């Protein structure tokens, strides 16, 4: 009887710790449903129906492992990835890392900020510039929560992630996909032609976000409660739940595009405005509005996460700190310049993804090296199998991004 009480008590304590430590992965998961993912998934679904859903499944599993490694580094060492690079690499290398990480954070933010502005434009009927002003105001308001600590921000961003997931449950209801074909697309790999291979690479290549790798390790480095092993165990639950939700959203995006566009002959849908305008007559005004709202929620939350990540890389690499509102003001400027110059926002989205591809290997390689170092990690060091899987992911993601980069540059030129 006493043993049962002890077991129940320890089980309750473990659940309580899991709940207390839940949140960092929800912030990280937002990076996986940003407007860049909207554009890629919609294009893939419209062009190839359910045939590329399996790519989303595998991309999400890879991303899950990478986020677990990032979170584990923070828990095991009490330092984030940028700080570890600063401590272990020569100063010129550290400065190079900082500059490229800042450029990538700004390129990512450009895509996310413009994505949210497009969302406001679509649902409110305002101009893209007015949408950008609304995006700026909304992100400042969300960032103000940081003054009250990490938890309120985690709750708001987690809420926005759940809102986007709920929006796509509604979209699935409206579009009524063929569940048998959907299931087949998730399980059976298919690449019907070279364009499908390129789009599949786009889905996979755009999934892993370097700025989120830096950020996640900083969100877990100051976690308290329980032993390191217990915190790591709780964090695995956090990552599993948050990334499963993000994975569902990506699957639902592609499945909705397949059901609504591909099977009605609209296979050429390539941008967010086009998707919104085509959804309305095909499904309903409500379906188009829900799409617009989900784009705003994803854009706002991901641009906030991008601002936080930029702060982490600056403090981690060069120990320099500027107020978040100053950083937000500076990183908004490229978006306003792009809009005022009248440049094509979808083209800018694509080009920002190209810039992003440069930083993936630079974040992944040191992450794997540090988490495989027994002196640094102690009992949380990577197992041999995790190391092997990790390096396979690195090689695959880097190869795909190089291929994507070459293909995109040739396509843009």
Swiss-Prot record:
It is found in: Cell inner membrane. One of its GO terms (molecular function) is cadmium ion transmembrane transporter activity. One of its GO terms (cellular component) is plasma membrane. Its main location: membrane. One of its GO terms (biological process) is iron ion transmembrane transport. Keywords: Cell inner membrane, Cell membrane, Ion transport, Membrane, Symport, Transmembrane, Transmembrane helix, Transport. It is a multi-pass membrane protein. Residues 1-19, 72-95, 146-155, 221-238, 298-327, 371-387 are cytoplasmic. It comes from the Bacteria. Residues 40-51, 119-125, 176-196, 259-276, 345-350, 407-413 are periplasmic. Coiled coil: none annotated. The chain crosses the membrane at residues 20-39, 52-71, 96-118, 126-145, 156-175, 197-220, 239-258, 277-297, 328-344, 351-370, 388-406. HAMAP family: NRAMP. Belongs to the NRAMP family. H(+)-stimulated, divalent metal cation uptake system. This is Divalent metal cation transporter MntH. It comes from Salmonella enteritidis PT4 (strain P125109). The lineage of its organism: Bacteria, Pseudomonadati, Pseudomonadota, Gammaproteobacteria, Enterobacterales.
């Amino acid at each position: 009887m006493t043993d049962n009480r002890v077991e129940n008590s320890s089980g309750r304590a473990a659940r309580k710790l899991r709940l207390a430590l839940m949140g960092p992965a929800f912030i990280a998961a937002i990076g996986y449903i940003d407007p860049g993912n909207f554009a890629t998934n919609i294009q893939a679904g419209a062009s190839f129906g359910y045939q590329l859903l399996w790519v989303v499944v595998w991309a999400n599993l890879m991303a899950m492992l990478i986020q677990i490694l990032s979170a584990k580094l923070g828990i095991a060492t009490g330092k984030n990835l940028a700080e570890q690079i600063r401590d272990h690499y020569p100063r010129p290398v550290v400065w190079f890392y900082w500059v490229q990480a800042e450029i990538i954070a700004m390129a990512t933010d450009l895509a996310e900020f413009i994505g949210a502005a497009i969302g406001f434009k679509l649902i409110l009927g305002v101009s893209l510039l007015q949408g950008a002003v609304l995006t700026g105001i909304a992100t400042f308001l969300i960032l103000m929560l940081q003054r009250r600590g990490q938890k309120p921000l985690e709750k708001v961003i987690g809420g926005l992630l759940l809102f986007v997931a709920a929006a796509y449950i509604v979209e699935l209801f409206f579009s009524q996909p063929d569940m048998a074909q959907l299931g087949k697309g998730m399980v059976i790999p298919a690449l019907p032609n070279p364009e499908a291979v390129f789009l599949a690479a786009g889905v996979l290549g755009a999934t892993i976000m370097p700025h989120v790798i830096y950020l996640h390790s900083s969100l877990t480095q100051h976690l308290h409660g329980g032993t390191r092993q217990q915190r790591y165990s709780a964090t695995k639950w956090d990552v599993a739940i948050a990334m499963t939700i993000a994975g569902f959203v990506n699957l639902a995006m592609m499945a909705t595009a397949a059901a609504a566009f591909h099977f009605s002959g609209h296979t050429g849908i390539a941008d967010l405005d086009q998707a919104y305008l085509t959804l309305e007559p095909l499904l309903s005004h409500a379906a188009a509005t829900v799409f617009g709202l989900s784009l705003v929620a994803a854009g706002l939350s991901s641009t906030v996460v991008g601002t936080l990540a930029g702060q982490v890389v600056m403090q981690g690499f060069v120990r320099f700190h500027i107020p978040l509102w100053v950083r937000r003001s500076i990183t908004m400027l490229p978006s306003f310049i792009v809009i005022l110059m009248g440049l094509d926002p979808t083209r800018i989205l694509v080009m920002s993804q190209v810039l992003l591809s440069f930083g993936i290997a630079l974040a992944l390689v040191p992450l794997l090296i540090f988490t495989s170092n027994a002196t640094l990690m102690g009992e949380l060091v990577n197992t041999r199998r995790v190391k092997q899987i990790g390096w396979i992911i690195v090689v695959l993601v880097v190869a795909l991004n190089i291929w994507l980069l070459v293909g995109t540059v040739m396509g843009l030129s």
